[in-house]
Each structure stands twice: as structure tokens, then as C-alpha cells.
Amino acid sequence: HVCGLGSRDTLRIEAGYPLYGNELNTSLTPIQAGLGFFVGAELKQTLKEQFPNNLPKVVYFKVLEKAPPPRNGYEIFEGESSIGKVTSGCLSPLTGEGIGFALVNSKISLNESEKYSIFIRNRKYSLMFMKRGIIYS
């Protein structure tokens, strides 16, 4: 059972809500943080012109195997190449799966389970990137 900040983190991660200092900060644009829908069309176009498409972006994931909880700083891989790190993660009480946010530096594919993995406690586990929030899936 979780309580205090642990319950806050679990609930926000399950819902797909980012946290300032983890998934949101002054060095990421709203588009990188996955919040482009809050930005007006004119500013969105300006941001896209100013920043290349290969900038890191915040994405939501779930671990596809029984695994320890994903934690901040754990590496995400595409094949053998590191493509990013976890910014927030937990085990979901709803599904029993590891879920979280990661900052990745490459284009990723949603709902593909063959390509991606996470390194947790010296072992790789398969993961899948998905739309935010397991309660909305």
C-alpha cells in the first residue's frame, strides 16, 4: 500500500499527469513535454521552427513483464542503444505493471513491444510506449 508522496506519484503517473521538476522544467518546450495542445497554433509553429524534431521528448510507458518498479534515472533502450532515461515510475496498483514517464532522444513508436526495453537492477525488461495514462487506455 502506498501513502503520502508515494500515493500522489502513483495516482498522477496512472493518470498520465507530469510533475514539475521531473517531466516539466524550463529547458523543455511544451511540445517536448507532450503539452502542445495547450499552446496556440501560432506559438506552436514558432516552437517547431526554432527547435529541431530530434530534441528529447517526454513519453509515457508501461513495462510488459513482471519487474521491479521503474525508477528515476533507469535507462531506456531501443535494441542495444540507450535512447533515454526514466523521469518518474512506479508499480500501478490498478494493473500491477510498471508504468512511468521517460525523456527519450529519438522518435519512438507507440504500442510497439518488440523494440524497447528498460534496464532495472541489472536486467532488461520489455516495455511499450503508449498514450498518457493507463486509466485512459
Question: Each predicted region: which residue ranges?
Answer:
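Conserved, structured C-terminal
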Residues: H1-S137
